[in-house]
Amino acid sequence: MAELQEVQITEEKPLLPGQTPEAAKIHSVETPYGSVTFTVYGTPKPKRPAILTYHDVGLNYKSCFQPLFQFGDMQEIIQNFVRVHVDAPGMEEGAPVFPLGYQYPSLDQLADMIPCVLQYLNFSTVIGVGVGAGAYILSRYALNHPDTVEGLVLINIDPNAKGWMDWAAHKLTGLTSSIPEMILGHLFSQEELSGNSELIQKYRNIITHAPNLDNIELYWNSYNNRRDLNFERGGDITLKCPVMLVVGDQAPHEDAVVECNSKLDPTQTSSLKMADSGGQPQLTQPGKLTEAFKYFLQGMGYMASSCMTRLSRSRTASLTSAASIDGNRSRSRTLSQSSESGTLSSGPPGHTMEVSC
């Protein structure tokens, strides 16, 4: 394996409006379940996986991930990886509305489209970053193709199929709420929606006035008809790669993420609960999530000497990452952090980290 590159940065900052954005290459490929559009940034790096993202319902890759990947400190990461942002069918900008009666793919079928994307690009492995429905899709893909997934960052994942009580509540809500309002309730907490901040107003406007709202409803229906992933700690059905679960404190999917954490391999899984981040931490707290993503990559043997930014200014943090590179690329990690409010330390993955700075 090539020697790990050390990159030093001194401060975090949003991407300035005057900075030149990366060139994007947009591709579409036919799959057994229809066409899928994806956008590629950067060039492949030797012996490094691609970062592949999948967005949630009501969003596309830009509205879901742009605040995170355009964040100043994230540039240290993305200059070391090629990125592939997948848009669910009909969610890409300018997508035509599907004809009446169109059979939208299930979430399992959306996962089955990903091999076509990787084959088209000639990419062998990925690190997946998914939110909500996208987190489910990437998890299903990882279960079906474990050898091609090096790691997963799963934000707001709900691995369970809807039960009868969920269905009853969903149907009842549908009688009194519009599709945009139901999707907003999926994306954000009730506290956020009641506060009606600029962020909420922005995303309410995006979803309510989306020209492809009929397509969004089809994706929403597929999400609500998802199958149970049937994760089982110690069983055959589990994620084989390192996993970082992320959820905001008091977010709509907090309980589902906690339950998911209890079902995954504790030696491979870290759980990050972010305070003051609401339902979409990649939108509201890109700095904190970037820092956590750096830790995650370091634990996998990438970017082992990346310096600290926001967290280092608010607390004392130490990171020890030891990687044993063999045929199975086994890796281990230790993270300890202390602050004025107390000490949080963890050994191997399988812990819950609460970030409140």
Swiss-Prot record:
Modification Phosphoserine occurs at: 312, 314, 318, 321, 324, 330, 336, 338-339, 341, 356
Bias-annotated ranges (Low complexity): 333-347
UniProt entry keywords in alphabetical sequence: Acetylation, Cell projection, Cytoplasm, Developmental protein, Differentiation, Neurogenesis, Phosphoprotein, Tumor suppressor, Wnt signaling pathway
Region (Disordered): 1-20, 320-357
Coiled coil regions, renumbered to chain: none
Modified residues (Phosphothreonine): 20, 316, 320, 334, 343
Cellular localization per UniProt: Cytoplasm; Cytoplasm, Perinuclear region; Cell projection, Growth cone
Modified residues (N-acetylalanine): 2
InterPro entries per the UniProt record, alphabetical: AB_hydrolase_fold (IPR029058), NDRG (IPR004142)
Keyword Flavoprotein: no
GO-annotated cellular components: growth cone; perinuclear region of cytoplasm
Protein family membership: Belongs to the NDRG family.
UniProt protein name: Protein NDRG2
